[in-house]
Amino acid sequence: MKQALVDYITSDGITHGLDFHTEAKGAFLEAFDRIILQPREMDYRLQFTGPTGANAVEAALKLARKVTGRDRIVAFTNGFHGVTLGALACTGNGYHRKGASRPLDGVD
């Protein structure tokens, strides 16, 4: 197992994808299903969650921009989604938004 981990890391595989699918997560899910769930006839679903809601907002921003090809995001007043640059940009509340030294481009 240690060698498999070293091989994956040295092949420049994604090691931390937060909310996104990676080869490592896919391989883990296949192995977990084969080794743990199927032998016990368990029909479970697994979910990888990010550490915070702000991480989910950041992932959603990236995914929305990638899928649509657009770069504009709409922000609503009084929405608060965390203190990362992207999450702060997604609130229309000036008090929270000014906490970031530089606003994220493309958020109105």
What residues fall within each predicted segment?
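Glycine-rich phosphate-binding segment of PLP-dependent enzymes
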Residues: M1-E23, A27-F48
